[in-house]
Amino acid sequence: MNLMLTLITNISLSLVLITVAFWLPQLNVYTEKASPYECGFDPMSSARLPFSMKFFLVAITFLLFDLEIALLLPLPWAMQSTNLTMTLTFSFLFLTILALGLAYEWKQKGLEWTE
């Protein structure tokens, strides 16, 4: 009974919100509000704008290290496993690969914003 009541409530609330959002008109329509916005770039201009390669490399490096940190987050739970030696070995190997990647980026001057 509680499941049916919850489902009916959720569906009816969703339908009411969708109906209100669909039927309410925009109060003030300006050209700025009606035009598409794409990260500050003019959507009607050429798609081949000059782009800073240094910014791209720093952004990709940040994304890679951010992903690697996300892979390190489950380590405290992995420490509770029965084979602690294997877990610590893989963790140390993973951190070593991270450190080597960071050292390589640093040596290639990929982390410097200005030259």
Curated annotation (Swiss-Prot):
Lineage, top-rank taxon, reads Eukaryota
InterPro entries, alphabetized: NADH_UbQ/plastoQ_OxRdtase_su3 (IPR000440), NDAH_ubi_oxred_su3_sf (IPR038430)
Q: Where in the cell is it found?
A: Mitochondrion inner membrane
This protein's GO cellular component annotations are:
mitochondrial inner membrane; NADH dehydrogenase complex
Q: What PANTHER family has UniProt attached to this entry?
A: NADH-UBIQUINONE OXIDOREDUCTASE CHAIN 3
**Function recorded in the entry:** Core subunit of the mitochondrial membrane respiratory chain NADH dehydrogenase (Complex I) which catalyzes electron transfer from NADH through the respiratory chain, using ubiquinone as an electron acceptor. Essential for the catalytic activity of complex I.
Protein's UniProt name:
NADH-ubiquinone oxidoreductase chain 3
